[in-house]
Curated annotation (Swiss-Prot):
<dbReference type="InterPro" id="IPR042262">
    <property type="entry name" value="CN_hydtase_beta_C"/>
</dbReference>
<comment type="pathway">
    <text>Organosulfur degradation; thiocyanate degradation.</text>
</comment>
<dbReference type="GO" id="GO:0046265">
    <property type="term" value="P:thiocyanate catabolic process"/>
</dbReference>
<keyword id="KW-0378">Hydrolase</keyword>
<dbReference type="InterPro" id="IPR008990">
    <property type="entry name" value="Elect_transpt_acc-like_dom_sf"/>
</dbReference>
<protein>
    <recommendedName>
        <fullName>Thiocyanate hydrolase subunit beta</fullName>
        <ecNumber>3.5.5.8</ecNumber>
    </recommendedName>
</protein>
<comment type="function">
    <text>Involved in the degradation of thiocyanate.</text>
</comment>
<comment type="subunit">
    <text>Heterododecamer consisting of 4 alpha, 4 beta, and 4 gamma subunits.</text>
</comment>
<dbReference type="InterPro" id="IPR049054">
    <property type="entry name" value="CN_hydtase_beta-like_N"/>
</dbReference>
<dbReference type="Pfam" id="PF21006">
    <property type="entry name" value="NHase_beta_N"/>
</dbReference>
<dbReference type="GO" id="GO:0018760">
    <property type="term" value="F:thiocyanate hydrolase activity"/>
</dbReference>
Amino acid sequence: MSSSIREEVHRHLGTVALMQPALHQQTHAPAPTEITHTLFRAYTRVPHDVGGEADVPIEYHEKEEEIWELNTFATCECLAWRGVWTAEERRRKQNCDVGQTVYLGMPYYGRWLLTAARILVDKQFVTLTELHNKIVEMRERVASGQGLGEYLPPKAK
C-alpha cells in the first residue's frame, strides 16, 4: 500500500472515529442469568436519562447564543423541513446513540452537528470522503488566517 493511500485511509479512519460513540469492549454477551441489577441498569439507561442520579446542583448561567449555534439550529431545521430526518430520528441519534462519553463531553449544538453529519452520511446525501474533504478544507482556511466569513473573521495582520 503506497504512503499516500495509507495516509488517506488514516484520515478516513480518524473522521470515522470522531463520528462514532466511544466503544466499550465486552468479550461476550452475558446470559440472562448473569445480568445483575447494576448491569441491567447500565444496558437500559440512556445518557440523557439522569433522573435519580446522585449529583450536585449546577449553577445556571445565562449565555448569549453564538453564531455557529444559531446556524446549526437553522441548518438542522432545514434538514427536517426538506425531509432528510424526523424529529424522532434526530433525538434518537443525538441523545441515545452517541454514547455517554460523547453526550456528556460535547456542547449541546455540537451534538446536533454530529447528528446531522451522521444522518447525511448514513442516508447517502454525502459520502464520508466528501465530508472529510470539507472538514480538511475548513481547517486549512482557518489555519491560513482566511477565516470562515461571518462565522470566524480573518486574523488581523
